[in-house]
Amino acid sequence: MYQDLIRNELNEAAETLANFLKDDANIHAIQRAAVLLADSFKAGGKVLSCGNGGSHCDAMHFAEELTGRYRENRPGYPAIAISDVSHISCVGNDFGFNDIFSRYVEAVGREGDVLLGISTSGNSANVIKAIAAAREKGMKVITLTGKDGGKMAGTADIEIRVPHFGYADRIQEIHIKVIHILIQLIEKEMVK
């Protein structure tokens, strides 16, 4: 009944991944991002991650696998997803939704820390404000974006972009693969 739809969905996902994989710049950006994050941890820094909707879940997943574990047991790494409901509701109510991430970065971000901003469109105003706040603090910035990078294009030290112009879920599927690879590479870098 739905077999053709299932095949089409899986084929489109495979094609999106294949297109991303063809561009060596993506491979180099992932490697550079992992080294940047590990270097920050080694120097006593931390990573803050943020995004909206599914990207918010990815930001939380990224932090959880760093503080918890990925595939093997090892020490936890300093990672915080900006996801505290009381913070988000307070700042959203008192200042506005566009400030929910930047206020947190202003409060706890330090020079030498890293911000991971995730947006499939690259146009999330609250992530863009978080990037500006991170810059004010002297933090490094890594972004996971999609399509043409949107307004976030060119704002990061390292941008990892999935140039897919269809639905956001295809971009998110690549983002989670990138997140898992970043964690794997960070773990390798941390034991060097």
UniProtKB/Swiss-Prot annotation:
The reaction produces a racemic mixture of D-glycero-alpha-D-manno-heptose 7-phosphate and D-glycero-beta-D-manno-heptose 7-phosphate. It is found in: Cytoplasm. GO terms for molecular function: carbohydrate derivative binding; D-sedoheptulose 7-phosphate isomerase activity; identical protein binding; zinc ion binding. This is Phosphoheptose isomerase. The keyword Metal-binding applies. InterPro entries: GmhA/DiaA (IPR035461), Phosphoheptose_Isoase (IPR004515), SIS_dom (IPR001347), SIS_dom_sf (IPR046348), SIS_GmhA/DiaA_subfam (IPR050099). Its cofactor is Zn(2+).
